[in-house]
Amino acid sequence: MATPSEKLAESLQVLKELQDKDNSLVIYGTTQLSRTHLNRLKLNGWLQEVLKGWYIVSKPGAEGDTTVWYSSFWSFIKAYCNRKYGDQWVLSPELSLDRWSGSTVIAKQCIVKAPEGANNVTNLLYGTSIFPMKGKLPENIVKDPVTGVNVYTLEEALINVSPSFFVLNELTAKICLSLVQDSSAILRLLADNGASVRAGRMVGAFRHIGKDDIADDILRTMRGFGYDVRETDPFEKPADESLAFSSPYEARITLMWKEMREQILPLIDKSERKIDDVKGYMSSLDVKYKDDAYHSLSIEGYQISAELIEKVRSGNWRPDAEDKENKNALVARGYYLAFQ
């Protein structure tokens, strides 16, 4: 007769096979796992319930730890929406721009648009929620390369966000505008929809970040089509010098430094520092890597490994100090080697 450890190892093996198949951190009830495996994994802390019938892969001892949820958030949104709406859904224009800008912040409320959306809030874990808004889908939907969720194209999202977005989310808006290489896609969308007011906002936005060629092209072409386009700057702060980036991460770092440098520079000690105790100073550097490792622990979703299954099967898995210390030691060692 199989021992409890062997039964748990069997369930973990089934879970691992699911993860290996589609790299999923999300389980939808008994459609993917038998009730026996599901209950066993849930009881032992390997699955955490998000909604009735919906689970994310967790680990024992992670109860109350938000890391597992936030690292699984977009996987859950994708799996949940795909199950409810097939491919007929997309993140809101605002959240689409968050994804285009490389933002890693998880919104408290995830707004998705779907023709079959119910216009009601579904509460998720740790104060987050999803709001499926009933509405027409954009002309084109693309996959976010990082999370796989459905998003607006960059150009269509910029056109469709509200004017207040450029004030309330200035950094994201500027990053996304800076990634636009030419006016062709935006012009086609504006002209096809006769969007003269939005065209004026796009002209002002591109001129604000120094992309006068795109701004002039939109203005000239739309007026040539007979539209009464009036340029309006949607930003409140003074205009920028020319911003053009190929990577959202490059744009984010550059713009954040530009915004914060005046506050940071006075805090930097520029005076020459003479180190009398060289040995003590080097010892202090050796200690710093531990703090760096602690504050930089990975928040990737939890993956089941063959080694872990074998430890559980043999009864050697203990979600206590020993296993946690082993993990932290490996992480600290990796950061130490990088620190060198």
Task: Mark where each language-model region is.
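Extended, Lys/Arg-enriched charged tracts that mediate electrostatic binding to polyanionic substrates
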Residues: 92-95, 101-113, 254, 266-285
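A residue-level signal for conserved active-site and pocket-lining positions in enzyme catalytic cores
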Residues: 96, 158, 293, 335
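Short beta-edge/loop segments at beta->alpha junctions of small alpha/beta modules
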Residues: 2-88, 127
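Hydrophobic alpha-helical interaction segments
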Residues: 1-5, 138-263, 274-283, 324, ...
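Hydrophobic/aromatic-lined pockets within catalytic cores
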Residues: 42, 101, 163-167, 194, ...
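Surface-facing alpha-helical segments and adjacent helix-coil boundary elements at the starts of domains
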Residues: 118-120, 125-128
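Short helix-loop-helix/strand-helix junction enriched in hydrophobic and basic residues
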Residues: 38, 50-53, 81-120
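Active-site core of Fic-domain adenylyltransferases
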Residues: 226-235, 272, 279-283, 295-340
